[in-house]
Swiss-Prot record:
Organism: Homo sapiens
Known function: Inhibits the activity of the calcium ATPases ATP2A2/SERCA2 and ATP2A3/SERCA3 by decreasing their apparent affinity for Ca(2+).
Gene giving rise to this polypeptide: ARLN
Binding partners and assembly: Homooligomer. Can also form heterooligomers with other sarcoplasmic/endoplasmic reticulum calcium ATPase (SERCA) regulators ERLN, PLN, SLN and STRIT1/DWORF. Monomer. Interacts as a monomer with ATP2A2/SERCA2; the interaction results in inhibition of ATP2A2 Ca(2+) affinity.
Region (Disordered): 1-37
Record's signal peptide: none
Annotated protein name in UniProt: Sarcoplasmic/endoplasmic reticulum calcium ATPase regulator ARLN
Length: 66
């Protein structure tokens, strides 16, 4: 039997081809996480400003408690 020949029932060649196509297809399915306008979906600056605003509101609420 030759080194490059498929197995007895021919499944080795199919398995190799299927594995190769699945591996190649995985690269095409990866898409960048972005919104409709091209900006990133998750804005860390927005999170920062919301966190600061929340802290200020909580501080003022606790400070002015009777």
């Amino acid at each position: 039997m030759e080194v490059d020949a498929p197995g007895v029932d021919g499944r080795d060649g199919l398995r190799e081809r299927r594995g190769f196509s699945e591996g190649g297809r995985q690269n095409f399915d990866v898409r960048p996480q972005s919104g409709a306008n091209g900006l990133p979906k998750h804005s860390y600056w927005l999170d920062l400003w919301l966190f600061i605003l929340f802290d200020v509101v909580v501080f003022l609420f606790v400070y002015f408690l009777p």
